[in-house]
Amino acid sequence: MEHFDVAIIGLGPAGSALARKLAGKMQVIALDKKHQCGTEGFSKPCGGLLAPDAQRSFIRDGLTLPVDVIANPQIFSVKTVDVAASLTRNYQRSYININRHAFDLWMKSLIPTSVEVYHDSLCRKIWREDDKWHVIFRADGWEQHITARYLVGADGANSMVRRHLYPDHQIRKYVAIQQWFAEKHPVPFYSCIFDNAITDCYSWSISKDGYFIFGGAYPMKDGQTRFTTLKEKMSAFQFQFGKAVKSEKCTVLFPSRWQDFVCGKDNAFLIGEAAGFISASSLEGISYALDSADILRSVLLKQPEKLNTAYWRATRKLRLKLFGKIVKSRCLTAPALRKWIMRSGMAHIPQLKD
């Protein structure tokens, strides 16, 4: 049975960043359900926008995005729609439009060969015994059993590691549904849509490489029905759909209280969305994935006396920032307040008409 310093479950942005930063400093194994390359297998349903905070993380790491990760076009504003109030406003935003699956594979490709990476793998079981974490996973057609001193859950909204550490922990979840259509709009755009009759979260659209992506986060019980109803409503706002080319769905976390942020225990750690580190106001998680990976890297390499306590303390600023997003979300999803803000014209950039 092979033993490692660190076992990382999941290689999204958080897991890939951590594996890269620990390479050569600790003995690391990393498991991921995505393939190493290509479009087959699992891909994360996501609008694919890189926020300024995520861009800053790449600046700190001295990384630049390859052209095959960047999508077309680059859009500098968000069209914000309040369906019930029939209001539309344009707000400046500095996102980078990316191909999310290509981005995830690129992040994995940066992991040095000193890290033992298993692609297209499935973690079957984890448990703690004799001060070690045991992991059973399936890869390359057979089951393997390894042990590790530290276990890292970077496995997203449905984190197996989080459920093992906190079996009674409850956090609000939504089903994120996206459909891809051939682009029909004369001018590509990115939108953020609020309709409290459909969801107390929000919906979105983005133009990307000749496609129009429409999606949103909806209650788990009847999400598909709500998604279809909203699509019908959006014709009044000149949204054009046609026949769906592709449909996607996944679970997304929606933190709504301080206790929703959990960092781990017993030499197991949670990073990224597995820890609840996702913005409640925008559902943006890449920047917090990168930041939490960097924080954990620092803790693991410094080796303080109580690592879990040190990681909890080190993420306090990040958790406070995310709690602020919870407050912001409550403001944005409050119909009267949102209507007042949009009607005020604050920060709105009117589009010139011919």
Swiss-Prot record:
It comes from Escherichia coli O139:H28 (strain E24377A / ETEC). It comes from the Bacteria. Coiled coil: none annotated. The gene is cbrA. InterPro entries: FAD-bd, FAD/NAD-bd_sf, Geranylgeranyl_reductase. One of its GO terms (molecular function) is FAD binding. This is Protein CbrA. Belongs to the CbrA family.
